[in-house]
Amino acid sequence: MGILVISVDLQCCRCDAKIRKVLGCLEEEYCIEKVEYDVKNNRVIVRGKFDPEKLCKKIWCKAGKIIKEILIVDVWPPPLPPPCKPPPCEKPPEDCKPKPCHCCSCEKPKPKPKPCHCEKPKPCHCEKPKPCEKPPPCKPEEPPKPPPEKPPPKPECKLVPYPYPVPYPYAGQWCCPKPEPPKPPPEPPKEPEPPKPCGCSHAFVCVCKPAPPPPPPCGCSGGHGNCGCGIRPWPPQVWPPPPVCPPPPWCYTEDNANACSIM
């Protein structure tokens, strides 16, 4: 069973979130069984059935910027060292002990100093040192706001030259519509073609051309007297003139050669 001890600054919210995300992604791939976060000592203990060297290299590649150190251990926490026993005291040899003196010339031991009756030190009324405040958690950086869109440019007024001063009042100075372009002049009418000579020898009446069609019947009685069809009425009927009177008998006439010889 492999054990990794990763040293990371868990007080930093970004480092904490980064190492949790990386270990969460590698949990199934490397069979990580247990992950312990020691916030006080800034350590992360990873346990599981994995190759510690391969997992160590993978974590360095994924989160190398926030990791301070990675240790590969067999047992965690490490066993405490045995307490140090003081060396046994050597007994002084008996020969070194001073022997009591039985003579009267020995000096008497000095008297013990009397206890001091001075005033006891007054207790200190200073303020106790306050514990260090924890740094505020790092706030995630806000994504940069997109730059505000520029307003569309205002339409520029085109200045048109005009005579100065302008006569007053001058209606429609700016409201006049755009003048229409001049129309092209109309084409001149075509001259009718002259009639072509038919080339026939009839002097008075030409038979080369077909006769015009007869006028349509107007449906009137035929007299065209009070008809509104626009056709002139027929001329009135005229009786034949009376025969010429024979010449008087006294008139001289030439003999008719064809007459009978008896007459």
From Swiss-Prot:
Keyword terms: Metal-binding, Plant defense
Phenotype on disruption: The pi21 allele confers an improved non-race-specific blast resistance toward Magnaporthe oryzae.
Function: Involved in defense responses. Contributes to slowing defense responses toward Magnaporthe oryzae.
Coiled coil: none
MF terms (GO), sorted A to Z: metal ion binding
PANTHER family reported for this sequence: HEAVY METAL TRANSPORT/DETOXIFICATION SUPERFAMILY PROTEIN (PTHR47488), PROTEIN PYRICULARIA ORYZAE RESISTANCE 21 (PTHR47488:SF12)
Domain named HMA: residues: 1-68
GO term, biological process aspect, one: defense response to fungus
Region (Disordered): 126-153
Originating organism: Oryza sativa subsp. indica
Biased composition (Basic and acidic residues): 139-153
Protein name: Protein PYRICULARIA ORYZAE RESISTANCE 21
InterPro entries: HMA_dom, PI21
Chain residues that bind a metal cation: 12, 15
Top-rank lineage group of the source organism: Eukaryota
